[in-house]
Protein backbone atom coordinates (compact mmCIF):
# COMPACT_ATOMS: atom_id res chain seq x y z
CA UNK A 1 0.00 0.00 0.00
CA UNK A 2 1.38 3.41 -0.97
CA UNK A 3 2.07 5.63 2.04
CA UNK A 4 3.08 9.09 0.81
CA UNK A 5 3.64 10.42 4.33
CA UNK A 6 6.08 7.62 5.13
CA UNK A 7 7.78 8.05 1.78
CA UNK A 8 8.19 11.77 2.41
CA UNK A 9 9.58 11.09 5.88
CA UNK A 10 12.07 8.63 4.45
CA UNK A 11 13.18 11.03 1.74
CA UNK A 12 13.53 13.83 4.30
CA UNK A 13 15.69 11.60 6.47
CA UNK A 14 17.88 10.74 3.49
CA UNK A 15 18.18 14.41 2.60
CA UNK A 16 19.10 15.30 6.16
CA UNK A 17 21.69 12.57 6.25
CA UNK A 18 23.17 13.90 3.04
CA UNK A 19 23.45 17.46 4.39
CA UNK A 20 26.89 18.92 3.99
CA UNK A 21 28.69 20.31 7.09
CA UNK A 22 27.99 23.78 5.67
CA UNK A 23 24.23 23.04 5.52
CA UNK A 24 24.23 21.73 9.09
CA UNK A 25 26.01 24.85 10.26
CA UNK A 26 23.43 27.05 8.51
CA UNK A 27 20.59 25.14 10.20
CA UNK A 28 22.33 25.40 13.57
CA UNK A 29 23.09 29.10 13.20
CA UNK A 30 19.48 29.86 12.29
CA UNK A 31 18.13 27.67 15.11
CA UNK A 32 20.33 29.29 17.77
CA UNK A 33 19.42 32.76 16.50
CA UNK A 34 15.66 32.08 16.43
CA UNK A 35 15.24 29.71 19.38
CA UNK A 36 17.91 30.86 21.85
CA UNK A 37 19.24 34.35 21.16
CA UNK A 38 16.11 36.18 20.00
CA UNK A 39 13.92 34.97 22.91
CA UNK A 40 16.66 36.00 25.36
CA UNK A 41 16.88 39.47 23.81
CA UNK A 42 13.07 39.72 23.97
CA UNK A 43 13.10 38.86 27.70
CA UNK A 44 15.75 41.52 28.21
CA UNK A 45 13.55 44.12 26.51
CA UNK A 46 10.54 43.16 28.64
CA UNK A 47 12.62 43.31 31.83
CA UNK A 48 13.92 46.77 30.93
CA UNK A 49 10.43 48.01 30.07
CA UNK A 50 9.36 46.88 33.52
CA UNK A 51 12.45 48.52 35.02
CA UNK A 52 11.53 51.87 33.46
CA UNK A 53 7.94 51.58 34.69
CA UNK A 54 9.17 50.50 38.11
CA UNK A 55 11.47 53.52 38.47
CA UNK A 56 8.59 55.84 37.64
CA UNK A 57 6.20 54.10 40.03
CA UNK A 58 8.73 54.06 42.86
CA UNK A 59 9.53 57.73 42.40
CA UNK A 60 5.82 58.63 42.30
CA UNK A 61 5.26 56.75 45.54
CA UNK A 62 3.04 54.02 44.07
CA UNK A 63 5.61 51.23 44.47
CA UNK A 64 7.48 50.12 47.59
CA UNK A 65 11.25 49.79 47.73
CA UNK A 66 11.14 45.98 47.93
CA UNK A 67 9.11 45.80 44.71
CA UNK A 68 11.47 48.24 42.98
CA UNK A 69 14.41 46.11 44.02
CA UNK A 70 12.68 42.96 42.75
CA UNK A 71 12.17 44.58 39.34
CA UNK A 72 15.85 45.52 39.27
CA UNK A 73 16.83 41.91 40.03
CA UNK A 74 14.76 40.72 37.06
CA UNK A 75 16.58 43.16 34.79
CA UNK A 76 19.91 42.09 36.25
CA UNK A 77 19.11 38.44 35.58
CA UNK A 78 17.96 39.17 32.03
CA UNK A 79 21.27 40.92 31.37
CA UNK A 80 23.26 38.04 32.88
CA UNK A 81 21.46 35.61 30.56
CA UNK A 82 22.31 37.80 27.60
CA UNK A 83 26.05 38.00 28.18
CA UNK A 84 26.99 34.69 26.46
CA UNK A 85 24.95 35.87 23.46
CA UNK A 86 26.79 39.12 22.77
CA UNK A 87 27.21 39.05 19.04
CA UNK A 88 26.14 41.74 16.63
CA UNK A 89 25.25 45.32 17.60
CA UNK A 90 25.34 44.87 21.38
CA UNK A 91 28.91 43.59 21.17
CA UNK A 92 30.05 46.61 19.16
CA UNK A 93 31.21 49.97 20.43
CA UNK A 94 30.64 50.45 24.16
CA UNK A 95 27.01 49.36 24.22
CA UNK A 96 27.55 46.52 26.71
CA UNK A 97 29.30 48.97 29.06
CA UNK A 98 26.20 51.16 28.85
CA UNK A 99 24.16 48.27 30.27
CA UNK A 100 26.49 47.45 33.14
CA UNK A 101 29.79 48.97 34.19
CA UNK A 102 32.06 46.19 35.45
CA UNK A 103 34.71 45.86 36.74
CA UNK A 104 34.62 49.02 38.82
CA UNK A 105 38.02 49.00 40.51
CA UNK A 106 37.89 52.59 41.78
CA UNK A 107 34.23 52.95 42.82
CA UNK A 108 33.56 55.17 39.83
CA UNK A 109 29.89 54.20 39.99
CA UNK A 110 29.39 55.52 43.50
CA UNK A 111 31.37 58.70 42.91
CA UNK A 112 29.76 59.61 39.60
CA UNK A 113 26.23 58.82 40.77
CA UNK A 114 26.72 61.18 43.70
CA UNK A 115 28.05 63.88 41.38
CA UNK A 116 25.00 63.63 39.13
CA UNK A 117 22.60 63.45 42.07
CA UNK A 118 24.11 66.65 43.50
CA UNK A 119 24.19 68.52 40.18
CA UNK A 120 22.11 71.68 39.88
CA UNK A 121 20.48 70.51 36.64
CA UNK A 122 18.48 67.26 37.07
CA UNK A 123 19.46 64.57 34.59
CA UNK A 124 17.00 63.07 32.11
CA UNK A 125 17.22 60.13 29.68
CA UNK A 126 18.40 62.37 26.83
CA UNK A 127 21.25 63.95 28.76
CA UNK A 128 22.13 60.62 30.38
CA UNK A 129 22.74 59.07 26.94
CA UNK A 130 25.54 61.61 26.48
CA UNK A 131 27.02 61.03 29.93
CA UNK A 132 29.64 58.49 30.98
CA UNK A 133 28.66 54.83 30.56
CA UNK A 134 29.51 54.48 34.26
CA UNK A 135 26.19 56.05 35.24
CA UNK A 136 23.95 54.85 32.39
CA UNK A 137 23.31 51.28 33.43
CA UNK A 138 22.43 48.66 35.98
CA UNK A 139 25.44 49.27 38.25
CA UNK A 140 24.32 52.86 38.86
CA UNK A 141 20.69 51.79 39.29
CA UNK A 142 21.82 49.14 41.78
CA UNK A 143 23.84 51.73 43.72
CA UNK A 144 20.81 53.98 44.13
CA UNK A 145 18.46 51.21 45.30
CA UNK A 146 20.88 49.19 47.44
CA UNK A 147 23.84 51.32 48.52
CA UNK A 148 22.80 54.96 48.88
CA UNK A 149 22.65 55.94 52.54
CA UNK A 150 20.36 56.48 54.38
CA UNK A 151 17.48 54.42 53.00
CA UNK A 152 16.48 55.58 49.52
CA UNK A 153 12.78 55.27 50.43
CA UNK A 154 13.17 58.43 52.53
CA UNK A 155 11.31 61.27 50.75
CA UNK A 156 14.27 63.66 50.69
CA UNK A 157 16.58 61.00 49.29
CA UNK A 158 14.02 60.07 46.67
CA UNK A 159 13.84 63.65 45.46
CA UNK A 160 17.61 63.68 45.09
CA UNK A 161 18.11 60.35 43.30
CA UNK A 162 14.85 59.84 41.42
CA UNK A 163 15.63 61.95 38.34
CA UNK A 164 18.70 59.78 37.73
CA UNK A 165 16.90 56.54 38.60
CA UNK A 166 14.11 57.31 36.15
CA UNK A 167 16.60 58.39 33.48
CA UNK A 168 18.52 55.11 33.81
CA UNK A 169 15.30 53.11 33.50
CA UNK A 170 14.34 54.99 30.33
CA UNK A 171 17.87 54.73 28.94
CA UNK A 172 17.97 50.96 29.45
CA UNK A 173 14.52 50.51 27.93
CA UNK A 174 15.44 52.59 24.87
CA UNK A 175 18.76 50.79 24.39
CA UNK A 176 17.18 47.34 24.66
CA UNK A 177 14.40 48.24 22.23
CA UNK A 178 16.93 49.69 19.79
CA UNK A 179 19.04 46.52 19.86
CA UNK A 180 16.04 44.21 19.42
CA UNK A 181 14.72 46.31 16.52
CA UNK A 182 18.16 46.10 14.91
CA UNK A 183 18.13 42.30 15.27
CA UNK A 184 14.71 42.07 13.64
CA UNK A 185 15.36 44.50 10.79
CA UNK A 186 15.43 43.27 7.18
CA UNK A 187 19.22 43.00 7.13
CA UNK A 188 19.69 42.60 10.89
CA UNK A 189 21.43 39.85 12.85
CA UNK A 190 18.51 37.43 12.67
CA UNK A 191 18.59 37.57 8.87
CA UNK A 192 22.39 37.45 8.81
CA UNK A 193 22.47 34.30 10.94
CA UNK A 194 19.81 32.65 8.79
CA UNK A 195 20.67 33.28 5.13
CA UNK A 196 24.17 33.20 3.67
CA UNK A 197 26.19 34.89 2.30
CA UNK A 198 25.46 38.38 3.64
CA UNK A 199 27.21 41.60 4.60
CA UNK A 200 28.45 40.17 7.89
CA UNK A 201 29.12 36.50 7.13
CA UNK A 202 30.49 35.00 3.92
CA UNK A 203 29.09 31.62 4.99
CA UNK A 204 27.49 29.83 7.91
CA UNK A 205 30.86 28.67 9.24
CA UNK A 206 31.72 32.30 10.00
CA UNK A 207 28.48 32.67 11.95
CA UNK A 208 29.19 29.54 13.99
CA UNK A 209 32.71 30.83 14.64
CA UNK A 210 31.24 34.12 15.91
CA UNK A 211 28.93 32.21 18.25
CA UNK A 212 31.80 30.16 19.64
CA UNK A 213 33.94 33.27 20.15
CA UNK A 214 31.10 34.85 22.12
CA UNK A 215 30.87 31.70 24.25
CA UNK A 216 34.60 31.58 24.92
CA UNK A 217 34.66 35.27 25.87
CA UNK A 218 31.63 34.88 28.15
CA UNK A 219 33.08 31.82 29.91
CA UNK A 220 36.38 33.62 30.40
CA UNK A 221 34.46 36.60 31.80
CA UNK A 222 32.65 34.33 34.27
CA UNK A 223 36.02 33.20 35.57
CA UNK A 224 37.08 36.83 35.99
CA UNK A 225 33.84 37.64 37.82
CA UNK A 226 34.75 35.00 40.38
CA UNK A 227 38.51 35.43 40.21
CA UNK A 228 38.59 39.19 40.84
CA UNK A 229 36.71 39.13 44.18
CA UNK A 230 38.48 35.92 45.17
CA UNK A 231 41.83 37.69 44.84
CA UNK A 232 43.14 35.59 41.96
CA UNK A 233 43.98 38.83 40.16
CA UNK A 234 45.41 40.58 43.23
CA UNK A 235 47.99 38.20 44.74
CA UNK A 236 45.46 36.25 46.76
CA UNK A 237 43.92 39.22 48.58
CA UNK A 238 40.13 38.95 48.48
CA UNK A 239 38.40 41.92 46.83
CA UNK A 240 34.67 41.48 47.55
CA UNK A 241 33.81 44.90 46.12
CA UNK A 242 35.24 43.85 42.76
CA UNK A 243 32.34 41.45 42.27
CA UNK A 244 29.58 42.07 39.79
CA UNK A 245 26.28 42.96 41.52
CA UNK A 246 27.87 42.89 44.99
CA UNK A 247 25.59 45.62 46.33
CA UNK A 248 22.48 43.53 45.72
CA UNK A 249 24.26 40.28 46.73
CA UNK A 250 23.38 38.78 43.33
CA UNK A 251 26.86 37.85 42.10
CA UNK A 252 26.35 34.09 42.34
CA UNK A 253 22.88 34.27 40.79
CA UNK A 254 24.31 36.20 37.84
CA UNK A 255 27.06 33.63 37.33
CA UNK A 256 24.49 30.85 37.26
CA UNK A 257 22.21 32.70 34.84
CA UNK A 258 25.10 33.36 32.44
CA UNK A 259 26.35 29.78 32.60
CA UNK A 260 22.85 28.41 31.97
CA UNK A 261 22.56 30.62 28.88
CA UNK A 262 25.93 29.42 27.60
CA UNK A 263 24.81 25.83 28.14
CA UNK A 264 21.68 26.51 26.07
CA UNK A 265 23.84 27.60 23.12
CA UNK A 266 25.84 24.39 23.52
CA UNK A 267 22.80 22.08 23.75
CA UNK A 268 20.35 24.15 21.71
CA UNK A 269 16.58 23.83 21.53
CA UNK A 270 15.57 20.48 20.03
CA UNK A 271 19.28 19.57 20.03
CA UNK A 272 20.10 22.28 17.48
CA UNK A 273 23.06 23.73 19.36
CA UNK A 274 26.82 23.67 18.89
CA UNK A 275 26.82 20.13 20.30
CA UNK A 276 24.88 18.87 17.29
CA UNK A 277 27.65 19.97 14.94
CA UNK A 278 30.09 17.43 16.37
CA UNK A 279 30.35 14.26 14.28
CA UNK A 280 29.70 10.87 15.89
CA UNK A 281 33.42 10.20 16.26
CA UNK A 282 33.57 13.24 18.59
CA UNK A 283 31.05 11.78 21.05
CA UNK A 284 33.71 11.59 23.76
CA UNK A 285 34.29 15.35 23.48
CA UNK A 286 30.55 16.07 23.55
CA UNK A 287 30.19 13.93 26.67
CA UNK A 288 33.15 15.69 28.26
CA UNK A 289 31.61 19.13 27.71
CA UNK A 290 28.21 17.89 28.95
CA UNK A 291 29.88 16.64 32.12
CA UNK A 292 31.80 19.90 32.61
CA UNK A 293 28.61 21.95 32.41
CA UNK A 294 26.81 19.53 34.73
CA UNK A 295 29.58 19.80 37.33
CA UNK A 296 29.53 23.60 37.36
CA UNK A 297 25.74 23.82 37.38
CA UNK A 298 25.46 21.36 40.28
CA UNK A 299 27.93 23.38 42.33
CA UNK A 300 25.91 26.54 41.71
CA UNK A 301 22.55 24.86 42.33
CA UNK A 302 23.72 23.31 45.60
CA UNK A 303 25.01 26.64 46.93
CA UNK A 304 22.70 28.95 48.90
CA UNK A 305 25.28 31.52 50.09
CA UNK A 306 26.04 34.83 48.45
CA UNK A 307 29.56 35.73 47.37
CA UNK A 308 30.27 37.91 50.40
CA UNK A 309 29.36 35.06 52.75
CA UNK A 310 31.50 32.61 50.78
CA UNK A 311 34.52 34.90 50.92
CA UNK A 312 34.23 35.24 54.69
CA UNK A 313 35.06 31.62 55.52
CA UNK A 314 37.73 29.09 54.59
CA UNK A 315 35.07 26.58 53.53
CA UNK A 316 33.45 29.21 51.35
CA UNK A 317 36.76 30.09 49.72
CA UNK A 318 37.40 26.41 49.03
CA UNK A 319 34.00 26.15 47.39
CA UNK A 320 34.77 29.17 45.20
CA UNK A 321 38.10 27.65 44.17
CA UNK A 322 36.33 24.42 43.22
CA UNK A 323 33.73 26.37 41.24
CA UNK A 324 36.39 28.46 39.53
CA UNK A 325 38.29 25.34 38.51
CA UNK A 326 35.11 23.77 37.13
CA UNK A 327 34.36 26.89 35.06
CA UNK A 328 37.92 26.81 33.82
CA UNK A 329 37.33 23.29 32.50
CA UNK A 330 34.23 24.44 30.59
CA UNK A 331 36.10 27.44 29.21
CA UNK A 332 39.19 25.49 28.13
CA UNK A 333 37.13 22.78 26.43
CA UNK A 334 35.36 25.41 24.33
CA UNK A 335 38.54 27.34 23.62
CA UNK A 336 40.60 24.29 22.75
CA UNK A 337 39.06 20.96 21.80
CA UNK A 338 35.67 22.26 20.63
CA UNK A 339 37.23 24.99 18.48
CA UNK A 340 39.56 22.45 16.86
CA UNK A 341 36.75 19.94 16.29
CA UNK A 342 34.68 22.63 14.55
CA UNK A 343 37.73 23.88 12.61
CA UNK A 344 37.44 27.37 14.09
CA UNK A 345 40.35 29.75 14.59
CA UNK A 346 39.38 31.82 17.62
CA UNK A 347 42.11 34.46 17.62
CA UNK A 348 41.86 37.00 20.42
CA UNK A 349 38.77 37.34 22.58
CA UNK A 350 37.30 40.54 23.96
CA UNK A 351 39.00 40.02 27.33
CA UNK A 352 42.53 39.74 25.97
CA UNK A 353 44.63 42.53 27.38
CA UNK A 354 42.44 43.02 30.48
Regions found by a protein language model. Give the residues of each.
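Mature extracytoplasmic or organellar-lumen-exposed domains after removal of signal/transit peptides
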Residues: 23-354
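C-terminal motif of bacterial Sec signal peptides marking the signal peptidase cleavage site
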Residues: 16-18
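Bacterial N-terminal signal peptides that target proteins for export
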Residues: 1-8
Amino acid sequence: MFRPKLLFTGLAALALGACSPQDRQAVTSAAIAKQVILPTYSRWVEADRQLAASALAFCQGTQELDAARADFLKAQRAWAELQPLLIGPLAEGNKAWSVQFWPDKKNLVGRQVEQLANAEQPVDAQSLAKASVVVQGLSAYEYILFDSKPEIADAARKARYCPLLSAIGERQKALAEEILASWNSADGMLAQMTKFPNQRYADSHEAIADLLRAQVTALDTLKKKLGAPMGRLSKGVAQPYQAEAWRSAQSMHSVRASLAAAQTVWVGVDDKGLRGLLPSEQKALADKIDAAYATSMKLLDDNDRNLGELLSSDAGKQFLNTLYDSLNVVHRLHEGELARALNIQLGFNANDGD
